[in-house]
From Swiss-Prot:
This is Leucine-rich repeat and calponin homology domain-containing protein 1. The lineage of its organism: Eukaryota, Metazoa, Chordata, Craniata, Vertebrata. It comes from the Eukaryota. Residues 88-97 have a biased composition (Polar residues). Keywords: Cytoplasm, Phosphoprotein. InterPro entries: Calponin-like, CH_dom, CH_dom_sf. Interacts (via LRR repeats) with unphosphorylated DOCK8 (via DHR-2 domain); the interaction prevents the interaction between DOCK8 and CDC42. The modification Phosphoserine is found at S87, S91. It holds the Pfam family CH. Acts as a negative regulator of GTPase CDC42 by sequestering CDC42-guanine exchange factor DOCK8. Probably by preventing CDC42 activation, negatively regulates CD4(+) T-cell migration. Residues 73-97 are annotated as: Disordered.
Length: 251
């Protein structure tokens, strides 16, 4: 029996030497058998379950993070303190500048002026000073007209000028025939109609314009007709006097 076994082994060795493909196949089969031994189904199940358990334990922190993120996105049972604790710390200077290093517009905005901080005494003094200047201008207007026309105007200067008669006589006194036709009251009709008053006022303003009074210093018709713009009228009359004085100096 021993001799027969040795003969069989020698025969197999000769066959393997003559057929190298068979040798490589046997070697690969033996390697497979050696590296991957066959085990029972129960052992494989236990190994798989153990492997799955290990994977489950290793991946459980990731799942918890995903669950926390899901709760945070849904806004359910996630307190602001937890969000603040989990969120990364941001320095105060991180948001001080916008893209490309530009500062937000709020940096350039000036603080709103507090109206309550204005001194009421200053407001009253400024108002009184303005009223004093206007009164002086109106008195100067009265003196200029009375001195040139040699008349005494009514105490209510606005009522004395509203029909435009005095103003037309003033411009004709400065430059004769500047206003060709003047509507004047008569004993029968002591008060002119509004249409005639407007015509006198418009003729006066047109004469001032022709004599060289700048447009920005010309008052409007309603400043005279409605007796609400004596300061504007005073500016117009003063400009008219200044223009005529300047022209007389250079002629």
């Amino acid at each position: 029996d021993v001799d027969m076994a040795m003969i069989e082994q020698l025969r197999e060795a000769v066959d393997l030497l003559q057929d190298p493909d068979r040798l490589s196949t046997d070697v690969s089969e033996r390697n497979v058998v050696n590296f991957y031994p066959v085990e029972s189904a129960e052992a494989l199940d236990l190994q798989d379950s153990a492997l799955n358990g290990q994977i489950q334990l290793e991946t459980s922190p990731v799942c918890e993070v995903q669950n926390d993120l899901t709760l945070q996105s849904n806004g359910s049972e996630y307190s602001p303190n937890e969000i603040r604790a989990n969120s990364p710390a941001i320095s105060p200077t991180a948001n001080s500048t916008g893209p490309f290093g530009l500062k937000p517009r709020s940096v350039f905005l000036r603080p709103q002026r507090n109206l309550e901080s204005i001194d009421p005494q200053f407001t009253i003094r400024r108002k009184m000073e303005q009223m004093r200047e206007e009164k002086e201008l109106v008195e100067h207007l009265r003196e200029s007209i009375e001195m040139r026309l040699k008349v005494s105007l009514h105490e209510d200067l606005g009522a004395a000028l509203m029909d435009g008669v005095v103003l037309c006589h003033l411009v004709n006194h400065i430059r004769p025939r500047s206003v060709a036709s003047i509507h004047v009251p008569s004993p029968a009709v002591p008060k002119l109609s509004m249409a005639k008053c407007r015509r006198n006022v418009e003729n006066f303003l047109e004469a001032c314009r022709k004599l060289g009074v700048p447009e920005e210093k010309l008052c409007l018709p309603h400043h005279i007709l409605e007796e609400k713009g004596l300061v504007k009228v005073g500016i117009t009359v003063q400009a008219l006097l200044d223009v005529t004085v300047t022209k007389s100096l250079f002629t």
